[in-house]
């Protein structure tokens, strides 16, 4: 599951504002080719959906929420990114922040989970297709958690407990 840090302000408050923008997150969701991730990173196993409790769980929110924003639709992603004002691009086609700097998102992964790096790389490629520059940062687990606790992660890939466990390791 990609987890966007909606309280991020560490290096660039403008990036933090985007991470808190619902339409920005939805646009990036539409840009992701989950079928490709399933085939290449998970050997064709699994089902692309949101990180919600499993269908047999009493807190399953229903199929509408489980599959919301999961279709791969780069055109819709581009339209949404344009609609929130990310229309300016650099010479390589990457979108620019309002200050003219290139938007560059960091996805943090822990190497203990080998396929997470692969997932991150596919997401980076998908986002590049809609003009969003991103990169995967592979970190040792202790550093990853330290950065999570100090609010220094932009985006992370972490597992989702689909049993509906009521507590989370995410800072609130």
Residue ranges and their predicted role:
Residues 1-43, 47, 52, 57-172:
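Extracytoplasmic/periplasmic ligand-capture domains
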